[in-house]
Amino acid sequence: MMNKLYIGNLSPAVTVDDLRQLFGDRKLPLAGQVLLKSGYAFVDYPDQNWAIRAIETLSGKVELHGKIMEVDYSVSKKLRSRKIQIRNIPPHLQWEVLDGLLAQYGTVENVEQVNTDTETAVVNVTYATREEAKIAVEKLSGHQFENYSFKISYIPDEEVSSPSPPQRAQRGDHSSREQGHAPGGTSQARQIDFPLRILVPTQFVGAIIGKEGLTIKNITKQTQSRVDIHRKENSGAAEKPVTIHATPEGTSEACRMILEIMQKEADETKLAEEIPLKILAHNGLVGRLIGKEGRNLKKIEHETGTKITISSLQDLSIYNPERTITVKGTVEACASAEIEIMKKLREAFENDMLAVNTHSGYFSSLYPHHQFGPFPHHHSYPEQEIVNLFIPTQAVGAIIGKKGAHIKQLARFAGASIKIAPAEGPDVSERMVIITGPPEAQFKAQGRIFGKLKEENFFNPKEEVKLEAHIRVPSSTAGRVIGKGGKTVNELQNLTSAEVIVPRDQTPDENEEVIVRIIGHFFASQTAQRKIREIVQQVKQQEQKYPQGVASQCSK
């Protein structure tokens, strides 16, 4: 798709040659036609990265024939819909903070990071409605954040101009900036940006950032990457997660530079051992990294001269819902191993993303939102789910917050309805939180609640936060969830590490539904919820294909 730019506030004396020369002098050559009108002009750039560079370089900064020109995307009023672009985002702004800011103005359907060569970040944001996007433009234009002033533009929403059916394909999840268009790419040829997640010892974080942020700025500049150090996650932990967004080559180079900094710091502080590389990877990808009988890992170890181990499933938690791949060896060896490991993980992830197009959309709730890019919705309005989550009674105040501030903020962030049911008695030990929303909203809301309970010390620091969740399923599908001789539910428990209880003698409610109880830590509970929903969906599809009698036989 061409990126048409509007050039405004031009003097009547300006010619096409003037514009071509001005753009050329600033290394922004115009290859296509320049459409010059009285006082304004239009130019096209096939590459969004070049378009952004032109806006940032020229708009409000360059004088031509005595007038300061304005440059922005050319979007007619009828195309000013749900899509906006935010530029000049601070390079070290945590994505979680940006998520919360964007969610204040409406439901965010998709956030894509645009790969640019600017020091600051650029994202394209799609709101659920035109009105929400309009409010966001008004409120965020010029918004000051860490001495950076946001710059906002409308960008064309292809769905407004194309007579497509109501079903919206390729609509991503909130906070999904990691899967932006590659420079020069189109929406059909989208490059999936698969970020590298690593754990670094907390004592090295200062060295990686450097004085006044100079070291990390140097890393991002040299490697054309974005490096997020999640300093606030899991306060007091010995290690902090670091997320690197870039091309595969840029990611690997940034990783190598971080390894070198840590090793240098370790040498100077006389730490005897080599600092291992710890890569975080989603559990669903790890099996394919290991390979049959461990062949893939053994091959990487042999070729790079490293020793590689992978954490057990039992280590999964809300703060680290990924497996930890520990690579031991020299800096050079670890860097070489990272290239090969990420190659395998990236390949597996891309295959999964292709699979999403033909399967139910539960992937989006299994892959953590801070790690990967947008996951397609398969309907304009994703199916609403209701989950009842039980929390300690003494934690209710922390979840609600002062005058309800925290629960309102949480609901906005997640895009869910969150209500706390009245206590069933004066001395109950648990209260029920009713969460209503699509899968992505469930993931975010439940994740934040688990995290809040951990942060506020309602559980022992060494104790895993385990909560009970109730979901309702049609009574006709309960047998399928249990499986013959309990086989399915046993496999489900082994896969997810959650306890799943489907009472056989439960009386269905007025909607012919029964309650499935799920007990476990956040990641275990989420995986179990998604797998159970998938089973229910499969039964529904069977019932649509076959007469009722046949379908009911199939479900038993």
UniProtKB/Swiss-Prot annotation:
The keyword Repeat applies. InterPro entries: IGF2BP2_RRM1, KH_dom, KH_dom_type_1, KH_dom_type_1_sf, Nucleotide-bd_a/b_plait_sf, RBD_domain_sf, RRM_dom. GO terms for biological process: CRD-mediated mRNA stabilization; mRNA transport; regulation of translation. The modification Phosphothreonine is found at T507. Keywords: Cytoplasm, mRNA transport, Nucleus, Phosphoprotein, Repeat, RNA-binding, Translation regulation, Transport. Pfam families: KH_1, RRM_1. It is found in: Nucleus; Cytoplasm; Cytoplasm, P-body; Cytoplasm, Stress granule. Residues 156-188 are annotated as: Disordered. The modification Phosphoserine is found at S11, S162, S164. Residues 3-76, 82-157 form the RRM domain. Residues 193-258, 274-341, 384-449, 466-532 form the KH domain. Residues 170-180 have a biased composition (Basic and acidic residues). GO terms for molecular function: mRNA 3'-UTR binding; mRNA 5'-UTR binding; N6-methyladenosine-containing RNA reader activity. GO terms for cellular component: cytoplasm; cytoplasmic stress granule; cytoskeleton; nucleus; P-body. Its main location: nucleus. Domain KH3 and KH4 are the major RNA-binding modules, although KH1 and KH2 may also contribute. The contribution to RNA-binding of individual KH domains may be target-specific. KH1 and KH2, and possibly KH3 and KH4, promote the formation of higher ordered protein-RNA complexes, which may be essential for IGF2BP1 cytoplasmic retention. KH domains are required for RNA-dependent homo- and heterooligomerization and for localization to stress granules. Can form homooligomers and heterooligomers with IGF2BP1 and IGF2BP3 in an RNA-dependent manner. Interacts with HNRPD. Interacts with IGF2BP1. Interacts with ELAVL1, DHX9, HNRNPU, MATR3 and PABPC1. RNA-binding factor that recruits target transcripts to cytoplasmic protein-RNA complexes (mRNPs). This transcript 'caging' into mRNPs allows mRNA transport and transient storage. It also modulates the rate and location at which target transcripts encounter the translational apparatus and shields them from endonuclease attacks or microRNA-mediated degradation. Preferentially binds to N6-methyladenosine (m6A)-containing mRNAs and increases their stability. Binds to the 5'-UTR of the insulin-like growth factor 2 (IGF2) mRNAs. Binding is isoform-specific. Belongs to the RRM IMP/VICKZ family. This is Insulin-like growth factor 2 mRNA-binding protein 2. It comes from Pongo abelii (Sumatran orangutan).
